[in-house]
Amino acid sequence: MSHQLTFADSEFSTKRRQTRKEIFLSRMEQILPWQNMTAVIEPFYPKAGNGRRPYPLETMLRIHCMQHWYNLSDGAMEDALYEIASMRLFARLSLDSALPDRTTIMNFRHLLEQHQLARQLFKTINRWLAEAGVMMTQGTLVDATIIEAPSSTKNKEQQRDPEMHQTKKGNQWHFGMKAHIGVDAKSGLTHSLVTTAANEHDLNQLGNLLHGEEQFVSADAGYQGAPQREELAEVDVDWLIAERPGKVKTLKQNPRKNKTAINIEYMKASIRARVEHPFRIIKRQFGFVKARYKGLLKNDNQLAMLFTLANLFRVDQMIRQWERSQ
């Protein structure tokens, strides 16, 4: 496929000021290990034959990444390729040749879902980060977040998604799913991900979030009782689990007497604060606030891709912080 620029594209590429989107895409161009990622998908990707020639795999992967960075539907992604030159150039496309339509973009997503390739990408990238010395193993921070799903029954099936469930948090009811994550305490990178319906108790998935090499586990008060769970009896770690808010409030009523206990709670809070970084990236940076698809499998695929990209975004943040400190 030709990468030759049209007049409009070449005019755009020579303009002086870079937009925030251009700067972001340029950073992602440099940080993503494209060869490692395409190697995961290549065995399953259609080969050129007698039929319609498929778009280059890396082009479709780049489009798929942009969908997640900018929270775009298949149709919105097709429109963006026509309307936004920086996104078209990032995908190595130009207006002088055919651009992938929404069906082609959707079929690529379905390919990843069918073979659970987003999960494989998550593992591949994390292995690459561990080999590079970025992902450590000393400690794991765990947390879970509720992801809302459409609760309306005004659809073709006239029912809510049967794989999503209702749960109460505080005084508010939520309908949807949960993303449970295990995060490297040193770097803030996500090493484990489990998706469930929203009514699943956080503690039930704790064992699936540990990699087995950590020396300590940090969590909020929702994980109280973890050391007593039968499935965690053999886990030999220091449990840094926050006390329940009521107990902390009682401690603060006599701060002089309980100074040490209060300081320990502050220490626990400062350690586990980093677990919020991945959620902040996918929600605020990438704009992911609601389950887009029906069923846990499709949404698990999207979340695995989001956390893969969030890890790489976090590495880019770390590199830029280091550069500023020099």
From Swiss-Prot:
A GO cellular component entry from the record: cytosol
Gene Ontology BP, a term: DNA transposition
Single GO term (MF): transposase activity
Q: Which UniProt keywords apply?
A: DNA recombination, DNA-binding, Transposable element, Transposition
Keyword DNA-binding carried by entry: yes
Q: Does the keyword DNA-binding apply?
A: yes
Q: Which domain of life is it from?
A: Bacteria
InterPro entries membership: Transpos_IS5 (IPR047959), Transposase_11 (IPR002559), Transposase_InsH_N (IPR008490)
Function of this protein? Involved in the transposition of the insertion sequence IS5.
Return the similarity comment.
Belongs to the transposase 11 family.
Instruction: Name the chain's protein.
Output: Transposase InsH for insertion sequence element IS5Y
